[in-house]
């Protein structure tokens, strides 16, 4: 599934905007770290241990990976490609621990949250179908993804105020 998606992103005759090279390379980096590096013995282990150490020092309960993209480079498209890669592999390889169908996307505000709705498979402007990010025969697999898009305010403690009667 991964190889097929990579071929699609590189070689498909897109009717509209094709993924930029930097978008494909960002996704390839995440794929390499997840699928290739663990199989490279000590060479891959070195990269993974470095990331594990940095994550443990920063926040031992949350593993993070950052992909650097310039302003306007299409981070939403990259998110859609990453979700597609993970969800399709999770559906087609249900016993694998490398892949997931569950995604939590935290936006910085309501405007961005609304723009990210294109990451929902059932949205009328879904990037998976409208931007042809997923081969048509794989689109039903994306429907199995569980995606929650919220904004960071949802995690703030709610304040209660007592208003005295009077």
Where are these regions (language model features)?
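RecA-like P-loop NTPase motor core of helicase/translocase proteins
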Residues: 1-166
